[in-house]
Amino acid sequence: MPAAEPVPQPGPSPAAGQQDRTGPAAPPAGTATLAAAPRVGLAVIAALAVAVELAVSARYGYHRDELYFLSAGQHLSFGYVDQPALTPLLARLSSLATGGTLAGLRVLPALTLGVLVLLTGAISRRLGANRAGQLLAALATATCAEYLGALHLLTTTTPDMLAWAVTLYLAVRLLDSRDPRWWLPIGITVGVGLAAKWNIAFLAAALLAGFAATATARPLLRSRWLVAGAVIAAALCAPDVIWQAMHGWPNLAVFHHLQGEAGHNRAVYWIAQVVYTGIAVTPLWIAGLVWSLRSAAGRTFRPAGIACAAVLVLQFVLGGKPYYPGGIYVFLFAAGAVPAGAGLAALPPIAGRVSRLAARMTVIVAAGAIGALVALPLLPAAALHTVPLQKINYDLAETIGWPRQVALIAREYHALPAAQREHTTILTGNYGEAGALQRFGPADGLPAAYSGANNFWLWGPPPAGDVDAIAVNPDLRLLRREFTTVRLVAIYTNGLGVSDDEEGVQIYVATGLRSSWAAVWPAFRDYA
């Protein structure tokens, strides 16, 4: 093993009159020295992870959420019904920078996976992992099915997972150095995370609880730098909070809808943690949880371990979706790498250590390849019919068929008499359908689509003169109440036999709007 390098010393302390009172001197950090980072190995693992994501970035098609964010990016705002403002902005910028291609849209999430791999290695080194442990931790992140699948798409999860990983890295630096100035970048990172997804609030609260529950870390809470970080975080998320307040807190309606899934989420929650991370690396993150909570070596970093455990339990109790706590595994893989790497170093001959490390990495890669089949569009889309991977990763099925659906809608629209088309709008039942029509409709000669779903409702009703409608996946009761005649004209199928939310969607022609769009539009609102 290479010789260990000394721990870098913290920078100069503030002047005596400016110094924070953070309590008595801390006990020694978890490690007296830090192992050298295997920079080439970490870079190779990160680069391979990014390359895999980019290689399949254009397969299948857009996810419904990506279509929605592209539409939202055309209506930039300080807030939206169902999420803060950052992801639509990223979608807009990515589209402008890459020419609006699907592969271009997914460059950012692919790069995010590479950063997560490097951060995992950096955290494990700070925790005291040797070179072998750092490589194991990085490889665990690179092959984690949850990270592979989530960072295949540009969604709110992209900046959210990055914010969690950076926050945990900064928390480790704070605990290791006991320099309270680390609260400032933590506050900035949490604030940026809140501008993408509210989920990181659970991590922030859990970290504060972890510090409060640990005697050696508790003095770090008595710091003006913590207050400054909190103020910055609040300032960064304030535009969204103000927007929500001005629009009647629509996010509460969305949350209420999601609570309807809580029972199912709890039923599959714990097994999902194993499936989503991967069977081969589950022992690693469990070891990391135990090491950070129970071992003497992990005592310095116990607040982070408490935070991860609290997030896991809290999301289960609240019935959150099983992937919500996914950001914690960067830390847990890194923590598990400390005892795993030490176990390898304890083997007597160097050949034995190398062969054992190679064997473990081979197992992780092999298991990761199986996870990649579930997480990524590696198989032909038609195979989803015979190999029902969408039962594990439903997002795969949500990326097929959108151009086909739009083409079917266009066929029915152009089948109408020209005079009728002049006053016919297109209505959809969900934001995915509306987003697909916005993305592919112009090429098929279709007018703008309208929907009552989430922010599409806020963007307003169809033109006042449009008294007829092509209605896709409508609330049939509402449609029949507001129009004189309603007739079924088509049923969409994806042609692959894949069961997804759009398979079997019905398309109607509705004529004779009984009132005005201004009068009936409130009834079409659907925050879900």
Label each region the model flagged.
Residues 357-422, 432-435, 439-445, 452-454, ...:
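Membrane-proximal, lumen/periplasm-facing interface regions of secretory-pathway glyco-
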